[in-house]
Amino acid sequence: MRILLTNDDGIHAEGLAALERIARTLSDDVWIVAPETDQSGLAHSLSLSEPLRLRKISDKHFALRGTPTDCVIMGIRQVMDIKPDLVLSGVNSGSNVADDVTYSGTIAGAIEGTMQGVRSFALSQAYLYEDGARIVPWEVCETHAPALLEKLMDLDLPEGTFLNLNFPNCRPGEVDGAEVTMQGKLAFNLQVDARSDGRGFPYYWLKFGERAGAFIEGTDIHALKHNKISVTPLKLDLTDYSVTDRVARALGYGAQV
C-alpha cells in the first residue's frame, strides 16, 4: 500500500513526524509532500499567482512552497509515479472540529485527496494551552491512530466522502474509545488586533477570543470533551438539500430534486 502524507503546519512539524510513524505501522511505502512553511488557516486554497518550488529532502520526502492542496496535487500528479492508495493529512497541532473544518488546511489535504479519487483521512490532536505554551500529547494519536486506521481503511465510503479524526487532550490510557460524530458548533469570536509599525503605519493581527458553544451529545466537540476520539464523516457536496424546495418556491419554480 502506498501512502501520501501532507499537513498544514509545515515540513518540520512534530505532527508530521508523528504521522509518518503512524503511517509506517501500516506500510513501508510512505511518501511525504508537505508545505515548506506553516500554512495553517489557508483551507482548500491553490497557489495560482506564483510558481510552486519543490525541494527534495530524500527519495520520498519533499517540501513544497505551496498550500496543503498544492502538496497533494503535486504528490499525486508530479512526485509519485503511481497513484497512492491512501492520503493522510496531519497530524494537526490542535483539533479541527465544528466550524474549524472550513478554515483548516489539514482538512483541505483530505479534501484534495478525495477529489483526486484517493481514500483520505484528516488527523488532528487536541492540546492544552498553558503558561503561553502548547502542550501537545502526540502519544495519544500515535497510540490509537494505527488500530483505528486499520479498521477504517477498507470501509466502503460513498464517493466524495472522507473521515475527520480528532484525538482528545489526555493521556493515552485515558482515551474512552472512539465515537462516530457530527460537526458541532463553536463561535470563533475572532477579533482584530490593530497595531502600528516603527514608522507609524497600521498593521493588524487576527486573534481568537473566548470560544463558546453547546457541547451537544453526538458532536465532535462533545466527544473530545469526554476523552473520546471523534470520527466525523465529511463530504465534498455542500448542497443543503433541505432548503432547495423552499428556494425554488421563492423563485416561483416547481419543487426541486
Curated annotation (Swiss-Prot):
The keyword Nucleotide-binding applies. GO terms for cellular component: cytoplasm. Gene3D superfamilies: Survival protein SurE-like phosphatase/nucleotidase. GO terms for molecular function: 3'-nucleotidase activity; 5'-nucleotidase activity; exopolyphosphatase activity; metal ion binding; nucleotide binding. Keywords: Cytoplasm, Hydrolase, Metal-binding, Nucleotide-binding. It is an enzyme of class 3 (hydrolase). Its cofactor is a divalent metal cation. Its EC number is 3.1.3.5. A divalent metal cation binds at residues 8-9, 40, 92. It is found in: Cytoplasm. Pfam families: SurE. It comes from the Bacteria. It catalyses: a ribonucleoside 5'-phosphate + H2O = a ribonucleoside + phosphate. Binds 1 divalent metal cation per subunit. Its main location: cytoplasm. The keyword Lyase does not apply. Nucleotidase that shows phosphatase activity on nucleoside 5'-monophosphates. Belongs to the SurE nucleotidase family. This is 5'-nucleotidase SurE.
